[in-house]
Amino acid sequence: MLGMRPAVLIGILALGLALGSIVLGHVIVVPTLQANTSLVDANLARALAEPLALRSAELCLAAVVVVAAVARAWLRHHAGTTLGLLAAGLAATDRFVILPRMHEAWARVDLVAMRPAARIEAAEQLSLIHEAAAGAIAVVLVAIAVLASWKREAKS
């Protein structure tokens, strides 16, 4: 690590933070909290999970913006910058468009009584869109990691 360029170190740390916030926040912590209804009812569990989901999305967005910023110097490949910007756009859309609408839709639903059915269906669709967006961000970040692991031949 001593001879490592700063852009490489920053890029690797930001990539790890972005992937970690997706996996830990959106895949492990938030679903576990929402599913744990033994101590609180389902409506309260979902309300308690909302700030965690938003903070996790904000961490991911910040890390992805850093990845996009250092991608050119870190990866030395045009595809790295493109993938970084794509991930940043997806993360921003997820945080500022999809998540607020999803949480608003779930707030209008009574999960204990499971009513109204039409609003539950709409909230489930928004949840599916959020999961697809988080998956797409993760795929783009893994593509960046693969691109970072390739050894490029030096130009002579």
Say what each PLM segment does.
Residues 52, 59-91:
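Helix-adjacent hinge/juxtasegments
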Residues 13-23, 82-99:
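Hydrophobic alpha-helical membrane-insertion segments
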Residues 85, 98-101, 105, 122-129:
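Amphipathic coiled-coil alpha-helices
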Residues 1, 79-82, 154:
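N-terminal, intrinsically disordered, basic low-complexity segments enriched in Arg/Pro/Ser/Thr
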Residues 28-35, 70-74, 97, 101-110, ...:
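Juxtamembrane transmembrane-helix termini
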Residues 15, 63-76, 136-156:
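Transmembrane alpha-helical segments in integral membrane proteins
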Residues 109-149:
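Alpha-helical transmembrane segments of multi-pass integral membrane proteins
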Residues 3-65, 103-124:
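Interfacial loop at the N-terminal end of multi-pass membrane proteins
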